[in-house]
Design a protein with these regions (language model features):
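Extended, histidine- and acidic-residue-enriched regions that form the cofactor-binding/catalytic faces
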Residues: 1-81, 85-102, 110-234
Length: 234
């Protein structure tokens, strides 16, 4: 067997090769007229890839399906069990072919948050240490709002001609999850976001977008460091 030069390149600790970073977003859901339907997947992928570049960890790509709570219907999603099974299969393959032993999941879609209840099952089925990072969801604000618009500006995926129509909530009620009254009733955070969009509208600020992305990337880098420290004695 060939001996790999695990210290080659800009690698601070060769154990980082045992860590994978995978993006988890949503490819098929509406975000208003200014943002593509795969906004969450692209933002999560960017964060995961940049963190992999900076840390030296393995970039494992992006998971295809996504989950959503039943009160919200703005796209095509799968059950939590189906999402769990997909993640398990992808991570088993990564473990087999790349020899990883831990993973950071970079989640960019709020509907995937219930996956936290399945992390123990995923660890048991894969034999991997799993960290779920949802920092960007905690930081970006309402669905299709200024945070996502500003990050989309940085990534070059925004249609700026349509920003003026982003808050036409009679036509694009998914923005801020405004149209989903049951979800707003059940979740104060969703209600707050919907009211913010209705009352304050949206804006695009490239500096803000960069700040959000850097905050999320640094959070993932910290998770990688924690895995190195706890799992590999770094």
């Amino acid at each position: 067997m060939v001996e790999l030069r695990v210290n080659a390149g800009n690698v601070k600790n060769p154990n980082v090769h045992k860590i994978g970073i995978i993006a988890l977003g949503s490819h098929l859901e509406n975000h208003g007229p200014a943002l593509p339907i795969d906004t969450d997947a692209k933002i999560a992928s960017y964060i995961a890839f940049r963190a992999a570049l900076e840390s030296g960890a393995k970039f494992l790509g992006v998971s295809y399906p996504a989950h959503e709570i039943k009160e919200i219907n703005h796209g095509i999603h799968v059950s939590l069990d189906d999402l769990t099974n997909e993640i398990v299969n992808v991570l088993k393959s990564a473990k087999k072919h790349l020899g990883i032993s831990s993973v950071v999941i970079v989640n960019g879609h709020g509907g995937n948050l219930p996956i936290v209840t399945k992390l123990y099952d995923i660890e048991e089925q894969t034999g991997l240490l799993i960290t779920l990072n949802s920092k960007i969801i905690e930081s970006e604000g309402p669905h299709g709002g200024s945070g996502e618009l500003s990050m989309a500006k940085v990534l070059g995926i925004i249609n700026e001609d349509e920003v003026k129509n982003q808050t036409d909530l009679s036509e694009y009620g998914e923005v801020g999850l405004f149209m989903f009254s049951e979800a707003r009733k059940n979740d104060p955070n969703i209600e707050e976001g919907a009211m913010d969009i209705e009352e304050n509208g949206v804006y695009v600020d490239e500096v803000y977008g960069n700040e959000l992305l850097k905050l999320a990337i640094n959070s993932v880098l910290l998770d990688v460091e924690k895995q190195l420290d706890s799992h590999y004695g770094y």
